[in-house]
């Protein structure tokens, strides 16, 4: 007798999801490595090797440092009144004027860099009884001796150097930055030759601050033919405040002020070339795209940049769990459900159906469940980027040798922040990956349950993601199941009749085996009963005695 399941009276419908031959390994909360059909790299690990000049205004310092440009070193005159978003200092920058030091170099550099301008306003300071515009052979401006263009070196006039007392109010509505200095001669003779007094002094004050500097006379290592030094200082005068300068010698006076601006301009040391291109994020290595949430190119950044992490790679799952398709399927060929494996041949959707009926075999994607999964996954990358991208810049920190402990503490804090963000990135990506896999599995289960509810008693769950349909189901019938218009009442009587026939035949085909097992069990039971009866009878007759000792 032929089985009803082998003729045209039944059909097989399987549900499955797509798969690829070689997936991508990602990390989730529960698994360090799980294969998915598709994933996106989240860590930017390389730069363009060049700094883009758009949309940020880049000012190439070339052979000048920012402080040299600020002071007006002769070879930096081209930077007068310049503006920038990012000032790029080069490793080959050098000073070419009178040797100087800035006791609070890092703070001054940072202050000017963030202001984003070298706009300078000359003011009418009155220096009575002294000679102005001093110069040095160490600071050539053309063939003649020169000096920093933003500073005024005051020396004796004749044989006198009177006490200077000058005030300059700030009647404007913005902060003013004044740069001034103190000259440290190399010998006592140089001191008296320039300033008459054996020891001079400078005091600069406002209502909020006061600085008093006494020259330190003594020989230092020769630089550009000079063993003396100039110490550069700075004072910020707020609106409504007054700048007061008192000196009896050694004063390097300001010629005016720099107009301070508030903004997010910055400075960066880099030897990367500047090119015409567009990039929001800049590192010392060059510009990098900011379409990823993380980067490990450089800790120092400017602009809207990915967050720096230690990891070289973090992959965000943008596809479902990948279960490559098995190559052999026995009698049913490739028709098997999602419980066993995915389907590599399905390219027009993530979820779908395969069927086998009287008209042959076929496959179709389920676009509704596919779109539901894609809608939930789309935007994941953008959401991660929004959570992590810096909207500000991270500048390099500089400290003098005296502030070594502060530098160590700052480094520790920065390293701790990087460790924390690296850990957070790991957890964030693992959580997102877990969510992606769970939701794609959920969509598969939803589709399977939806199909089960349609078929009801007309089909049987085969346990592998497939249904055995107990009625004739042509391609139109299969299509009605896929699109949700299937009416199980129409096929119920036929399905019940075929189910009973198939189950009955299956019972008859296994009848002999059941009889053998039942007969064996009864025989064993009867043998045990006879043996137990014989022992009891023998004990009563005295033929067998049983002693129990305690």
Curated annotation (Swiss-Prot):
Disulfide feature: 14-466, 52-277, 64-76, 97-139, 281-305, 473-477
Any one Gene Ontology molecular-function term assigned to this protein's record: host cell surface receptor binding
Modification after translation (UniProt): Palmitoylated. In natural infection, inactive HA is matured into HA1 and HA2 outside the cell by one or more trypsin-like, arginine-specific endoprotease secreted by the bronchial epithelial cells. One identified protease that may be involved in this process is secreted in lungs by club cells.
Lipid moiety-binding residues (S-palmitoyl cysteine): 539, 546, 549
Annotated site location: Cleavage: 329-330
GO cellular component: host cell plasma membrane; membrane; viral envelope; virion membrane
Sequence intervals crossing the membrane: 515-535
A biological process term (GO) from this entry: virion attachment to host cell
Ranges in the topological domain labelled Cytoplasmic: 536-550
Swiss-Prot/TrEMBL keywords: Clathrin- and caveolin-independent endocytosis of virus by host, Clathrin-mediated endocytosis of virus by host, Disulfide bond, Fusion of virus membrane with host endosomal membrane, Fusion of virus membrane with host membrane, Glycoprotein, Hemagglutinin, Host cell membrane, Host membrane, Host-virus interaction, Lipoprotein, Membrane, Palmitate, Transmembrane, Transmembrane helix, Viral attachment to host cell, Viral envelope protein, Viral penetration into host cytoplasm, Virion, Virus endocytosis by host, Virus entry into host cell
Residues in compartment: Extracellular: 1-514
Membrane topology: Single-pass type I membrane protein
Annotated glycosylation sites: 8, 22, 38, 165, 285, 483
Subcellular location: Virion membrane; Host apical cell membrane
InterPro entries: Capsid_hemagglutn, Hemagglutn_HA1_a/b_dom_sf, Hemagglutn_influenz_A, Hemagglutn_influenz_A/B
Chief localisation class: virion
Family, per entry: Belongs to the influenza viruses hemagglutinin family.
Functional description taken from the UniProt entry: Binds to sialic acid-containing receptors on the cell surface, bringing about the attachment of the virus particle to the cell. This attachment induces virion internalization either through clathrin-dependent endocytosis or through clathrin- and caveolin-independent pathway. Plays a major role in the determination of host range restriction and virulence. Class I viral fusion protein. Responsible for penetration of the virus into the cell cytoplasm by mediating the fusion of the membrane of the endocytosed virus particle with the endosomal membrane.
Complexes and interactors: Homotrimer of disulfide-linked HA1-HA2.
Miscellaneous information on this protein: Major glycoprotein, comprises over 80% of the envelope proteins present in virus particle. The extent of infection into host organism is determined by HA. Influenza viruses bud from the apical surface of polarized epithelial cells (e.g. bronchial epithelial cells) into lumen of lungs and are therefore usually pneumotropic. The reason is that HA is cleaved by tryptase clara which is restricted to lungs. However, HAs of H5 and H7 pantropic avian viruses subtypes can be cleaved by furin and subtilisin-type enzymes, allowing the virus to grow in other organs than lungs.
Full protein name: Hemagglutinin
Organism in which the protein naturally occurs: Influenza A virus (strain A/Duck/Hokkaido/33/1980 H3N8)
Lineage: Viruses, Riboviria, Orthornavirae, Negarnaviricota, Polyploviricotina
